[in-house]
Design a protein with these regions (language model features):
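Carboxylate-rich, polar loop motifs that coordinate divalent cations or form catalytic acidic clusters
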Residues: 1-170
Length: 170
């Protein structure tokens, strides 16, 4: 009898600590099934970059962010490729057509333009973002090289990174 009670106790104790699972689908929560990156920010929010928008999950509900024509505070492009939060809490979104900084206080996006040497905005495909030890961010683009970004002061400063390898290797 003692053995039976022990087995029942273990069964119910294990069941009580089991993880609940939930399947998120395009039909209900996600903007697209082609997921490029899943990122958990320092505040616990889960961000999901897809081919058709950016999805934010706060543990209770989803919010979907998409490009809105004529709205400079929306995503610059729906094809979100990469996400990154730096050590100071700046949250960056890299899309098929450029780089943006998310402001959680206003729930809006601000474009960080990358310019050719001629001064023309290149609308670069952002492929990766990482932080250097000195706090600068390296922005990898597809076919346009690597750029260094400083997020100090009121306006971000971005310039071509000086690396010991040619940018066409990136």
């Amino acid at each position: 009898m003692k053995t039976l009670l022990s087995i029942l106790f273990l069964f119910f104790a294990t069941y009580g600590y089991s993880q609940s699972e939930k399947l998120f689908t395009v039909d209900r929560e996600l903007s697209n099934s082609n997921i490029n990156q899943i990122y958990q920010a320092k505040d616990g929010v889960i961000w999901i970059a897809t081919d058709d928008g950016l999805n934010r999950y706060d543990g209770a509900k989803f919010s979907i962010y998409k490009h809105k024509e004529g709205n400079d505070s929306s995503l610059v492009d729906n094809n979100v490729r990469t996400l990154f939060e730096d050590s100071k809490g700046h949250f960056l979104v890299g899309t098929q057509r450029g780089l943006q900084l998310y402001n959680p206080a206003t729930d809006l996006f601000k474009e960080i333009p990358i310019f050719y040497q001629t001064g023309e905005n290149m609308s670069a495909h952002i492929s990766t973002i990482l932080e250097r030890k000195n706090g600068d961010l390296l922005i990898g683009t597809s076919g346009h090289g690597v750029y260094s970004l400083k997020l100090e002061g009121t306006e971000p400063v971005i310039k071509e990174a000086q690396l010991p390898v040619p940018s066409f290797f990136i």
